[in-house]
Amino acid sequence: KTDGGSRINCVSTQDHKSVSELLELRKNQQMVFQDPTGALDPRFTVYEILAEPLENQGMKRPDIKKRVVELMKIVGLQPDHVNRFPNQFSGGQRQRIGIARALAVNPKLVVLDEPVSALDVSVQAGVINLLEELRASLGLSYLMVAHDLAVIRHASDRVAVLYPGRIVE
């Protein structure tokens, strides 16, 4: 059973004494949400969505532009589409934008909440394959929450099955 705490890179998420320590921990962990439509602000362009975490980290404008282009390429989207709004993309493309946003600050851990459940079956494999490629090329660790064990088996090295908060398998 979980005790309400967690450790990331041997650092407790509960023992932080300062805001700067908590911000540093958050920088090293990012989240990709289940519903790409709900996770992206429809008032922002893709550029603004991807630039926001970089601005929050104090990155300079020319470096932000380069990083946004790099992120678009990394997730398999056309860099010249950065001035579009989320509603101009398909569900799979929106999920790729969410993945790019999570990768913007070079996290060590990405938490994926049902990353493909809201996508068409034909698009799911492409996103799972992208996640696999990114994990290998960027040295990422994933914590994936999903109900589809086939997706979990394909995308994971280790699996824990939970039932009412307890690991049962």
Label every model-predicted segment:
Residues E55, P62-D80:
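Conserved ABC ATPase "signature" region
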Residues N106:
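Conserved catalytic motifs of ABC-family nucleotide-binding domains
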Residues D35, F44-E55:
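Q-loop/switch helix immediately C-terminal to the Walker
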Residues L109-V111:
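Walker B motif beta-strand of ABC-family P-loop ATPases
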